Amino acid sequence: MRYKNSFSLVAILATMIISPQVLIAQSSSNNVTLIGALIIIGALILVAAVVTVSENLLQIEAKKHGISGNGRNVSLFPSLSDLSGSKLPSYTQGKGAYVLKKGYEINLTGKPSDEVFKKPVNRYAVRPTNFRGIAPIPKLVISEKDEVLAGDVLFYDKSNENIKYCSPVSGEIVEVRRGAKRAITDVIILADKKQKYRVNKVPDVNKASREGLVDFLLESGLWPLINERPFDVVPDPSKIPSNIFISTFSTAPYAPNADIVIDGNEDAFQKGIDVLAKLTSGDVHLGLDANKNSAPSSSLTDVKNAKTHWFVGKHPSGNVGVQIHHISSIKAGQSVWTLTLQNVISIGRMFLTGKYDVSKIISIGGAIEGKQAHYSTVSGANIGDLLGNSDLDEKRIISGDVLTGRTAGKGEFLD
């Protein structure tokens, strides 16, 4: 927190200085003393006006040149945190941080360990309801008993046929589940033991135009991995985002450890950032976690083609919406994109290998004996296969985090 109104500050100081003079003037018949006091008052008011204008101009120029925020005290006066001497972790390298004073420390039992396991999963699904803005009944291009490769198109959006949704695994389409009014709820695939991928011809990121990259993301099925704010929908391909935001950490309970997620995916992450940097008229912004004793992975802190911003505070400091508000809030008529750390990696993998690979790290926590850990799996994995034979009759399963996830059964699939 810093003094926002320098005029008020100077006015207070002026009052403290002038009050004795006024008292003297009132108690004295000497007109010279009264005139002197009035001159001092006028001078201090003039100084206050000059300081106020200077402070406002300084803030405007700082914002114009992109040097405001991120913990920088762009002001004529020291911030209260400067005066109190509060320290940020040394790994922030003096870059400052957004410090969120409010929030909640949500301590729940059953936190996942940092161990990573791989569990065999037989069934996977793509759920149209996971994608906001899509038509309630998308156009299927497959039927039950069809064989598909990982990356083959399953359906597309009727309102925009260029936006395609692909299979996360290779295997057989065993069921197309429908809900109310025949809306499709799940397209279920029985996975092959050995995965097979559709291989795409990948454009050169350095040489490709923005339009060429957009077309490739649409054709390859990666486009739905991106969200458009302020309404959190699958983006309109015709719009260019003002900025792109990625929160590299989550402060929600049981969230996966970002260092575990990035481990082994460093090149894919950087490649994903390189792609995204060509899709915006502004910048790619990365929110970094400054709450821990040790620094995040250097793949996150030393990333190229993106601006990094440190955040300190309780939940929801890891929420991308909170970070957008502090870094560069959305103005009227603007749209920005957001992605998760793991979706950036998936985009990068495509440009490195040509394969639609939506492998991911999830965490399982809570009152489930012996299962609290991280797991390597693929998007849309069956929840029952992941949990195995755990006794969950009297327990509630949540797909997603505890605060914003949905109640799910063992026969359902990860979002």
Task: Show where each model-derived region lies.
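N-terminal, Lys/Arg-enriched amphipathic/low-complexity engagement segments
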Residues: N56-V141, F311
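Short coil-to-beta-strand transition motifs
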Residues: N162-S170
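Short, solvent-exposed loop/turn positions at domain surfaces
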Residues: P136-I142, S159-N162, K371
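Buried, small/hydrophobic-residue-enriched core segments of structured protein domains
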Residues: Q26-N73, E161-I163, V176-D415
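Short, well-structured beta-strand-loop connectors
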Residues: I142-Y156
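N-terminal secretory/membrane targeting signals
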Residues: M1-A25
